[in-house]
C-alpha cells in the first residue's frame, strides 16, 4: 500500500473511510468563533512529548474560577498526526470533573466520557466505532441507569458511495419513566458531498433539518454557512461565518452573523515570534435585545 503524500493528506477529499457520523458538519463548524465573556488566562505546559497540562483562570459574571487540565497521548501511532490512547481531563476547585478516554485497536475505535458535578455522576457515555474500508458503524450508550431503567442508545452508519459522496443514517432511542409512552425513537438521514474547494452536508429527520456548507476560498480564507431547523419548537436559524488568517502577522479572525441578529467574533494575535503569547479578544452583540458581551484572554503556551 502506497504511503499518502502530504498533499493527499491535506486534501479536502477524504481518504477511503468516510470518517465518523458525528463529523459530518465539523469542517463548517470549525470556521465559527467560540466566543467567551469576561477575562481569561490560559497557560499550557508540555511536560513531555506525550503529556501536557493546562491552567485556566476565568473571571466573568457567569463563570469565575480556576480549572486544571491534563492531556496524555500514547505511543500507538495509527496516522501521520494520530496516536492512541488519548486521555483528557479537567477539574475545578469544587471537584467538578470531566474526563475522556479514546483508544483504537485495529479498525475499532472506542471513546469513554464521564462527568462529575457536585460529587455525583452527572453523565456517562461509551462509544465504539468500526471503521471499515468504505464505511463506519458506531454505537453509543449514554446515561444508562439500570436502577431507574433509563438511558439513551444511538446507532450510526456512514457509507462512502463515491470518492466525493457519503450517505448515512442515525437512530436515537431513549427510554425511561419520564418519557411519554416510556420510550421514543428518532430516525435521521444524512449526506455529504466533498469537492476540491467546498463541502456540503445535510442531516434530515423527524426532529428537524441541519445543513452546512464549507468553502475554502484560498489558503488563508474560509467561509461557513449553517442552517438549523428544530421542528419540535418551530424555530429556524441561519448563520454565516468566516475565518481569515495572516500567518506573517500571527493573526486569526473568526466572525459570525445569524438571523437572530446576533454578531460574534474572536480575534487572536500572536504577541511574539519567540515567545508563545497569544492575545484573544471576543465579542457578541444581539441587535434586537440590545445585549452584548466582551471577553479578553491571554494564552501562554
Curated annotation (Swiss-Prot):
<dbReference type="GO" id="GO:0006626">
    <property type="term" value="P:protein targeting to mitochondrion"/>
</dbReference>
<keyword id="KW-0472">Membrane</keyword>
<keyword id="KW-0813">Transport</keyword>
<dbReference type="GO" id="GO:0030150">
    <property type="term" value="P:protein import into mitochondrial matrix"/>
</dbReference>
<dbReference type="GO" id="GO:0008320">
    <property type="term" value="F:protein transmembrane transporter activity"/>
</dbReference>
<feature type="region of interest" description="Disordered">
    <location>
        <begin position="1"/>
        <end position="20"/>
    </location>
</feature>
<dbReference type="GO" id="GO:0031966">
    <property type="term" value="C:mitochondrial membrane"/>
</dbReference>
<dbReference type="InterPro" id="IPR027246">
    <property type="entry name" value="Porin_Euk/Tom40"/>
</dbReference>
<dbReference type="Pfam" id="PF01459">
    <property type="entry name" value="Porin_3"/>
</dbReference>
<comment type="function">
    <text>Channel-forming protein essential for import of protein precursors into mitochondria. Specifically required for nnt-1 accumulation in the mitochondria and may be involved in the secretion of daf-28/insulin from the mitochondria. Required for embryonic and larval development.</text>
</comment>
<protein>
    <recommendedName>
        <fullName>Mitochondrial import receptor subunit TOM40 homolog</fullName>
    </recommendedName>
</protein>
<dbReference type="GO" id="GO:0015288">
    <property type="term" value="F:porin activity"/>
</dbReference>
<keyword id="KW-0406">Ion transport</keyword>
<comment type="subunit">
    <text>Forms part of the preprotein translocase complex of the outer mitochondrial membrane (TOM complex). Interacts with mitochondrial targeting sequences.</text>
</comment>
<feature type="compositionally biased region" description="Polar residues">
    <location>
        <begin position="1"/>
        <end position="19"/>
    </location>
</feature>
<dbReference type="InterPro" id="IPR023614">
    <property type="entry name" value="Porin_dom_sf"/>
</dbReference>
<dbReference type="InterPro" id="IPR037930">
    <property type="entry name" value="Tom40"/>
</dbReference>
<dbReference type="GO" id="GO:0046930">
    <property type="term" value="C:pore complex"/>
</dbReference>
<keyword id="KW-1134">Transmembrane beta strand</keyword>
<keyword id="KW-0812">Transmembrane</keyword>
<keyword id="KW-1000">Mitochondrion outer membrane</keyword>
<comment type="similarity">
    <text>Belongs to the Tom40 family.</text>
</comment>
<dbReference type="GO" id="GO:0006811">
    <property type="term" value="P:monoatomic ion transport"/>
</dbReference>
<dbReference type="GO" id="GO:0005742">
    <property type="term" value="C:mitochondrial outer membrane translocase complex"/>
</dbReference>
<keyword id="KW-0653">Protein transport</keyword>
<keyword id="KW-0496">Mitochondrion</keyword>
<keyword id="KW-0626">Porin</keyword>
